[in-house]
Amino acid sequence: MTRITFPMIVLAVMITTGCTQQKAEQSQERLNLSNLDRTVAPGASFYQYATGGWQEANPIPDEYARYGSFDVLREENQVQIQSLITELGTQVNPVGSNAQKVGGLYALGMDSVKLNRDGAAPIRPQLEEIAGAKDKKDIVLLMAKVSRYASSPFFGFTVGADDKNSGMNIAHIYQSGIGMGDRDYYLLEDAHSRMLRDAYVALMETQFQHTGYTGAGAKQAAANVMKIETELARAHVTKEMRRLPELNYHKMWVSDLNAKVAPFEWALYFEAMGAADLDSLNVSQIEPVKAAVAIIRREPVAVLQDYLSWKVINSAAGYLSDDFVNANFEFYGKALSGSKELRPRWRRTIDAVNGAMGEAVGQLYVEKYFPAQAKERMLDLVDNLKTALGERISQLEWMDDETKSKAQEKLGTFIVKIGYPDKWKDYSSLEIREDSYWQNMMRASEFEYGEMIAELGKPVDKTKWYMSPQTVNAYYSPSSNEICFPAGILQPPFFYMNGDDAINYGGIGVVIGHEMTHGFD
């Protein structure tokens, strides 16, 4: 389950405890004793006692680094979505409809012949644009442009609620720009970290060569990127520090950025980001942004071009030919995550379509799979658990009356979202063309960026969802004090529409309680 903190920190905690057909649900809506290991005394190892049978019956598949009931449901959910999208392919869908766009994007992702024939051609226009940069001004403009459709270079830019005025959206810039995800992988000297660094450099060399670099050129480009990312990582704050809101809030006037952060072409950058009239923002982590600016000012244009090119190549790799995909998996799947086998193309493509057009897929999904009555059943469960939590708060001996009053107030004002949004996102301005899988993923990213930048300076939309309805997960958002349970998780083994209350409290009830307690982290 997920605690969503905006704009850029997402803390995910997935619960591994472990509706499409009533018959299937009825066969599961009771305690399955075969999941237990009754050869072990509960007092000796309750975990083994409670899950030993399930573990023995469900060995970790080669394509996973971890595996639990959550993952089983996610796989089943993907089968549902595949069935839905395959059905779209048998219909004549109006041009420009969500059904046509979803089906068209999925077809491009599944067309291995075209993907392998195209090779690196789909990213050639972006790489040529970067290669044409003549000076640092061009680099700043490209940095902004790339961040609209690829992994943020140098530092990130987003729009989200003001932590100290949660009803208003403001701009935030924050640490970003590293390809291995965590600073420790760049800095620690243990054998595993050194292995990852070597593997990451090897990945970059391979992918640069796939785009046409010579062997020597690819080696130099990879070294340039690694130098920049290591310097960025050295300035990045730790995961632990990012969890402390007071250390990640530095709101200031744009006119003060040169003095309080670093001299930079801020006006040019914000204009390129579509925020020319920006007057204030939050700099979540000052030192990493300062370090990024220092790199841009110091390094030659050619070195910065290699870095920006890598951001494009690495972001696009999963949507290109098999040589890109396989090299990407060797590092991100095997070395970094521990997976042994690449997931089937159809599963990867469904994930991509969900990411690109989440609510479009979600609208089709709930029409086919989610009964409206489930909302009412869930509301009853949530209300009962809120009451129970309120009673526990009132009985806490270690909490003073003033704090109890504040806690009860927060509990009483939880916004509860169940199943799917009341208003669906409008995808009419998003074009899905037949040119390439990657170019459509670019358009989808740029569409989402446009949706985000349109919220700048406006009140927070309390009706907005931060997960698509088909997602097998849930979240709590502190900025809006809301808990959300998408339709995707409201299926066995978490939720049974016609099941006994005891089964539902032991399944989705755990998830509800988990998200509620995030409100009191």
Predicted regions: what is each one?
Residues 1-8:
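Bacterial N-terminal signal peptides that target proteins for export
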Residues 45-49, 170-172, 482-486, 519:
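Structural recognition of the beta-strand scaffold that forms the well-ordered cores
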Residues 15-18:
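C-terminal motif of bacterial Sec signal peptides marking the signal peptidase cleavage site
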Residues 225, 260-263, 282-286, 343-350, ...:
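Intrinsically disordered, low-complexity linker/terminal regions across diverse proteins
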Residues 35-56, 190-209:
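Hydrophobic/aromatic-rich, well-ordered segments within soluble, folded domains that form packed cores
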Residues 88-379, 384:
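Noncatalytic, helix-rich "gating/capping" subdomain that lines the substrate-entry/channel surface
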Residues 41-44, 49-114:
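Active-site-surrounding "flap" and adjacent substrate/cofactor-binding loops of secreted or lumenal enzymes
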